[in-house]
Every structure is written in C-alpha cells, then in structure tokens.
C-alpha cells in the first residue's frame, strides 16, 4: 500500500478507498502468480492507477473504488483479447479439436500459456500417445521434426525413465511409444506437459480411457512427484472459458500441481463457478494422484493393467525372437 500511495501522490491521482487498494493488491499478486507475494513493477501499477483514476473522474467519483480498478484492468486485457478470442474460436468451431466431454484412450487435454508482451492467456492442447510392441523407445515427435525445445526433450526423457523404472525394472520395456501435441505448428518448449504426456502414455499402454472433461498441467521428476509450472491462473481460466462457451456440465475442471494451491488468483467468474460446483480445480502431488483423477480408476487397477499389457508384449517379443523376417521359423542353411 505504501507504493500505491507513492504512485498516487507522484501522479496526482485521486485517493483510493479500501476496495480500490484491495483490488490493486489483487492485481499485483496475480501478476506475480502468487497470492502471498506482490508484483512491484512500477510501470504496470502506474498504468493501472492512471486508467483507474480516469474512470473514477469520468464517473464523477471523489475516490478510486474497486469498480474503477476492475474496469481499468479489464480494459487493458480487452485491448489484446482478440488474440485469445481468435485462438479459442478455433476450438469452439472445431477447427482445433479439443474434447471437453466423454473419454478417450491415449488422449489428454494439456494446458499451454501464450505470452504477448505483458499479456498472456491460456489454451487447452490435445496431447496423444500410441504404444505398440517395440524396443522400449518413447518417440518425441516434436523433437524429431525440430519443433521441441531442449527442456521439453529433457522432460520426455524423464517420462521415459520414470515409465521404465516403474514397470520394467528387471527386464527391458518391450514397447515403443510416441507422443505428440496435435495440431501444433510452432515450437514446443517447457516441461509443464509432463503429467499430461505420462498419463496419455499409460492410458495408451493399458487401454484405459481418460476423462476429457478434465485438463491437466504439471511437471514431473523421476520419482513421479508433480512439480510447479508457470501461468497456472491463465491455464485454468483458458480451459474454463472453453467449457463455459460449450455449456458447463458440472463435472469439468483442471488438475494442477499441489504446489500451486497458494498461487491461485483467479477471475471472480471462475471462483463463483467453483463455489457453485460448476467447475473444479483439483490438485495432485504425485503422478498416482493425477492418474486416479484423470481416469477414475484406482492406482492399483491402473498398475495391474499396465503390467498385464507389458507381460503380453514380452510374450509377443519372445515369440518373434525365433521368427525370421517373413514370420517363419529361422533356420540354418545347412
């Protein structure tokens, strides 16, 4: 509040009432993606206060209230909102395919955040996986075509190691798998899709359907712990906007890392929907928790299905090891 008062005096602005101060603090906390910390970027705060002052004077008010700050913040967003609207329109017109209901095997709704200067917005992305008999390699299609960055490639390697360590400690993993961000035509960077990618892989291997009414974001370590990511508020709101536009079912929502529970600074509209049970924000601290939320199956059932499929692929691998190229029993020429 001291910085707010300093900027107010420096710019000769109207005083703020308690509601106005609270709204500015909320805005600053959202910019930091942390409800326990505030952004001290003077330029942004100065712009917000100046716009709020203009709105208050236009309304004939003697103080800047919460409604003036809210209007200023929304106006700043609206000026760049055409990019978000165009992106979301592609999903709503089904040009970009993203399901928000039903189930699908090997398909998960990931969440991405797009940055345009100081403006950012979230959008769901369809991530798919396939699994078949092979030599244990997880193919990162984004990397193969030079669309995947180094951090994303590292994340896929961590997923591969986690998968092998979990289901094939004492023998080679007898499968080949592939991962891809569908309908993505630009570079992919970051590790925030790690949870979504591993869930898609396990779903494809075990033939277990994933709830498409949920989206997920989160990084992973080799022990299966879900780690923090960036842009959590924008990602939640991006999926919420799509669900709302299509008509909320009451079962839609997002899964985020547990570490972000204190970082949420969501729009009031989203908070109201959560309070009314129309939208849900779940947290997961481990891949086990994420799997159970996204599939509705117990982790014991999921692991049993994966191990059964791995055992089946091992039997197939052994049967092929004695076959020639044409599938006939190999023999010496003697």
Segments (PLM) and residue ranges:
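Conserved AAA+ ATPase core "coupling" helix
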Residues: 1-9, 23, 292-295
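Non-catalytic, well-ordered alpha-helical scaffold segments
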Residues: 22, 43-46, 50, 67, ...
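Peripheral, non-AAA+ core regions of ATP-driven protein-machinery
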Residues: 93-96, 125, 131-147, 151-334
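Conserved helix-loop functional segments at active or binding sites
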Residues: 6-13, 26-34, 54, 58, ...
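C-terminal helical "lid" subdomain and adjoining coupling/linker elements of P-loop NTPases
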Residues: 10-16, 29-100, 317-324
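Core mixed alpha/beta domains of very large multi-subunit molecular machines
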Residues: 71-72, 78-149, 160
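Conserved phosphate/pyrophosphate-binding and hydrolysis machinery centered on Walker-type P-loop NTPases
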Residues: 14-21, 35-46, 62-66, 145-149, ...
């Amino acid at each position: 509040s001291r910085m707010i008062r300093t900027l107010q005096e420096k710019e000769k602005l109207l005083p703020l009432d308690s509601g106005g101060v609270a709204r500015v603090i909320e805005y600053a906390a959202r910019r930091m993606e942390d409800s326990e910390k505030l952004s001290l970027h003077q330029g942004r705060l100065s712009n917000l206060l100046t716009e709020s002052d203009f709105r208050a004077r236009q309304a004939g008010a003697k103080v800047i209230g919460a409604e003036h700050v809210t209007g200023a913040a929304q106006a700043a967003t609206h000026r760049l909102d055409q990019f978000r609207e165009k992106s979301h329109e592609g999903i709503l017109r089904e040009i970009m395919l993203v399901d928000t209901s039903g189930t699908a095997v090997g398909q998960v709704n990931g969440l991405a955040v797009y940055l345009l200067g100081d403006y950012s917005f979230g959008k769901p992305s369809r991530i798919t996986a396939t699994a078949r008999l092979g030599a244990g390699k997880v193919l990162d299609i984004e990397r193969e075509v030079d669309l995947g960055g180094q951090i994303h490639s590292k994340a896929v390697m961590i997923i591969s190691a986690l998968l092998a360590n979990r289901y094939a400690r004492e023998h080679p993993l007898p499968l080949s798998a592939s991962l891809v961000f569908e309908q993505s035509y630009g570079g992919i960077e970051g590790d925030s899709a790690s949870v979504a990618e591993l869930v898609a892989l396990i779903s494809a291997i075990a033939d277990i359907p994933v709830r498409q009414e949920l989206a997920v974001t989160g990084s992973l370590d080799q022990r299966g712990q879900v780690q923090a990511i960036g842009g959590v508020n924008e990602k939640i709101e991006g999926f919420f906007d799509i669900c709302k536009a299509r008509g909320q079912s009451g079962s839609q929502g997002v899964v985020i890392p547990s570490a972000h529970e204190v970082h949420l600074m969501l729009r009031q509209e989203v908070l109201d929907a959560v309070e009314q049970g129309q939208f849900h924000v779940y947290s997961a601290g481990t891949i086990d928790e994420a799997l159970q939320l996204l599939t509705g199956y117990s982790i014991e059932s999921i692991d049993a299905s994966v191990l059964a499929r791995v055992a089946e692929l091992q039997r197939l691998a052994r049967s092929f090891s004695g076959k020639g190229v044409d599938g006939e029993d190999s023999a010496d020429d003697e």
